Amino acid sequence: MSHPINVFSEIGKLKTVMLHRPGKELENLMPDYLERLLFDDIPFLEKAQAEHDAFAELLRSKDIEVVYLEDLAAEALINEEVRRQFIDQFLEEANIRSESAKEKVRELMLEIDDNEELIQKAIAGIQKQELPKYEQEFLTDMVEADYPFIIDPMPNLYFTRDNFATMGHGISLNHMYSVTRQRETIFGQYIFDYHPRFAGKEVPRVYDRSESTRIEGGDELILSKEVVAIGISQRTDAASIEKIARNIFEQKLGFKNILAFDIGEHRKFMHLDTVFTMIDYDKFTIHPEIEGGLVVYSITEKADGDIQITKEKDTLDNILCKYLHLDNVQLIRCGAGNLTAAAREQWNDGSNTLAIAPGEVVVYDRNTITNKALEEAGVKLNYIPGSELVRGRGGPRCMSMPLYREDL
């Protein structure tokens, strides 16, 4: 592989993918603090891990290399200097107000000799009771005395799609919607700065976690070697799309058109890929609830290097035909178009498919009506269980970050 990253489509045969196996961070979820951590329910860890292992094994059975974020992050801590730098940065972004408490956490983390154990600890979160003689020094600490964590867990991390996104040979290292998830992007920073697989190699960055406006990978879809679709959503700002479009054009990644899909700000469809995914050259899943009010903007580069933004005035299928150079496209509706089934199965990520080859996808087995519609459209389905993983509000695409796809 001349480039460590090669993603010029949503559907090219998947060769390498990054996952995160859920761990103790899920056991640090508590009913009183679910909203703070962007969860609606508490998955049963043992079952969630079994479901995730089934997902990984299915991918391996298709000759796909599976790498884990936690392993790459541990391997990126290549020496003691980088290791200490990681700990210092992690603590600076952990919102610990008390300097003495921060120093106790630093000592705790420095005492962990094994890098993989250190990464797992950073992901799981740290409870106040783990610190010797924890003292409340600030009014905020006293008001939040009942809150059990000095560092919040990262239960959303098994959705590896979001904290960065691969584009062509490059990446978008994202600025996340919430403080809870922003720390997740530290792992991506160290992986791409220091891991031997990527360090010193051509991996251009079209967005950086230090930017002031938010964007998440669930809103970033690579429709072709010329077209990127990005959702304007609960998690991604329009301003971020302008920034990333300029960077994509300036860095000559090969993409000529950025399509911005305005899907509104809703928890139930927080990202574009929860309501729209590409599954074949001319086939797409879509949640019918977004169709009526969907507005699409095209962003192109002008001759002077500035960007041109145009509001598209056609139907979604015609817009897709225009930019993907197709005669026809097929929009396969979640729930087969039935409003009740569509709402239920979209909530359970029926639209969130992962294409592993043109016309072949991974889906949750629970979304029976949508799955039947996909099969009737000639799509090959690979089923995984999802009774626990889905409680985090994400499906197969959310849980995977392609690092390498074959070109179409």
Curated annotation (Swiss-Prot):
GO cellular component, one term: cytoplasm
Active site: C398 (amidino-cysteine intermediate)
SUPFAM superfamilies: Pentein (SSF55909)
Single GO MF annotation: arginine deiminase activity
Pfam families: ADI
The family this protein is said to belong to: Belongs to the arginine deiminase family.
The name this protein goes by in its record: Arginine deiminase
Species this protein is from: Enterococcus faecalis (strain ATCC 700802 / V583)
Gene giving rise to this polypeptide: arcA
